[in-house]
Amino acid sequence: MKLIAGLGNPGGQYAETRHNAGFLLLDCLAEELKLDFRPKFQGLVAETMMGGEKVYLLKPQTFMNLSGRSIRELAQFYKIAPKDIMVVYDDMDLPIGRLRLRSSGSAGGHNGIKSTIAELGTEDFWRLKVGIGRPTAGWDSARYVLASFTKEELPVLEEILDKGIKAVTLWAKEGGDKAMNLYNR
């Protein structure tokens, strides 16, 4: 059993913001697989099979800074080990259009990942970072991540979400090393 959690903030005003890259990727994956989300574990949950294994998709509805609670609740209930958890989230340190898959690591200043580390009690879970780039001079970081993608960024976003879907699917079916070799370029 595996868990793929996409981080974001609930509510229409945040729906297409940079900070919701994790939600956006899971929405695209669920649409591709024709899955519906239902409320459970302080989040929205869908389930599917990948590579002969049950995989849960989770969009925590706790707001970003408390995302780990929802992830922990689902993981504990289904007895999913941290090594079988993938968290998808936005990363300002990567330029828009880049992905980076990691098997562990620090929060790197991301509050949703800080919460997940605290709730799981370990840094040893998979993460897929979706690059959103850094704000230009004069932009506050908090305002930047809560802003929508620009018209110019949308084609790049669409392409990277498609790549991200392929990366998490490969991770679920064949493991992280193969996915890292293919998508960390």
Swiss-Prot record:
The active site is at H19. Pfam families: Pept_tRNA_hydro. PROSITE patterns: PEPT_TRNA_HYDROL_1, PEPT_TRNA_HYDROL_2. Its EC number is 3.1.1.29. Keywords: Cytoplasm, Hydrolase, RNA-binding, tRNA-binding. The record marks N9 as: Discriminates between blocked and unblocked aminoacyl-tRNA. The record marks D90 as: Stabilizes the basic form of H active site to accept a proton. InterPro entries: Pept_tRNA_hydro (IPR001328), Pept_tRNA_hydro_CS (IPR018171), Pept_tRNA_hydro_sf (IPR036416). Disulfide bonds: none annotated. It catalyses: an N-acyl-L-alpha-aminoacyl-tRNA + H2O = an N-acyl-L-amino acid + a tRNA + H(+). It is found in: Cytoplasm. TRNA binds at Y14, F63, N65, N111. GO terms for molecular function: peptidyl-tRNA hydrolase activity; tRNA binding. GO terms for biological process: protein quality control for misfolded or incompletely synthesized proteins; rescue of stalled ribosome. One of its GO terms (cellular component) is cytoplasm. Hydrolyzes ribosome-free peptidyl-tRNAs (with 1 or more amino acids incorporated), which drop off the ribosome during protein synthesis, or as a result of ribosome stalling. Catalyzes the release of premature peptidyl moieties from peptidyl-tRNA molecules trapped in stalled 50S ribosomal subunits, and thus maintains levels of free tRNAs and 50S ribosomes. Monomer. Belongs to the PTH family. This is Peptidyl-tRNA hydrolase. It comes from Desulfitobacterium hafniense (strain Y51).
